[in-house]
Amino acid sequence: MNGVINIYKNTGMTSFDVVAMVRRVAKMKKVGHTGTLDPEASGVLPVCLGKATKIIDYIMENKKVYRVNLKLGMVTDTYDLEGEVLREEDASHITKDEILNCINSFVGTIDQVPPMYSALKQNGVRLYELARQGIEVHREARKITIYSIENIKIESNDNIQMDVCCSKGTYIRSLCYDIGEKLNVGATMTALERIQNGPFIKEEAINIEDLTEELLEKHIISIEKALDSFEKITVNEKFGKLLRNGVKVFDNRMYSEEVEFNKLYRVYEDNGVFLGLGKRDEKGFKLEKLLIEE
């Protein structure tokens, strides 16, 4: 079985727990998830089976959409409710307009400092392991992109909900913390749900608790379909043979569409055969990942 299954992870389980459950149902070992969701978070977690594990890195590049709840006036060491409360402040004077303006100021490409409680490594040691020892180290800010923040609901300063569309590597906990710091009252994430990962959406996900062999076979998505977020180009079959053999082709007759430099495309032969993912540079076009079904 080769393909991707759109799984909905419940709170209270790790992403590896989900993989283990899919392995049991599929009766196969070659299974991997496409981006960790913290145990206290829920939501869309595409899981790759068989040859589809080759495309895990590409699915991880997808834009993600998170539904997040945050509370103003409280800061914890983990930036969420799992941690120890470090400080509390009165946030009742903050107006809705101030909150909206602050939230919207984070849209765009920004520098974000990852939280101490994260799986990132420093000198070979995971940051959360240092944090548990009471050690805080300097973390370099990283460029991330917040594409949009929509559906902002301010029920009270204790409960703000919003949908955040962001790039790979974004820490929503850090976004909540940074919003609180900018408002000078602190903030903590209180709930997190991933509602979309590229073409994989919550409405089409199968709850991991409901997964059966029959459901898996019915809903598994082909490798080709799972890469729908990449633009498609078609090449002549003659050039397709060269690409299959790992040749970098420098010939503009190869494709009819306008092909940008350094952009990944889904590559098809003109007979409809899906070859894989390829990229063009100054020296020609080459398949980066051969994915043809043998």
UniProtKB/Swiss-Prot annotation:
It comes from the Bacteria. It is an enzyme of class 5 (isomerase). Pfam families: TruB_C_2, TruB_N. One of its GO terms (biological process) is mRNA pseudouridine synthesis. It catalyses: uridine(55) in tRNA = pseudouridine(55) in tRNA. One of its GO terms (molecular function) is RNA binding. The active site is at residue 38. Keywords: Isomerase, tRNA processing. Responsible for synthesis of pseudouridine from uracil-55 in the psi GC loop of transfer RNAs. This is tRNA pseudouridine synthase B. It comes from Clostridium perfringens (strain SM101 / Type A).
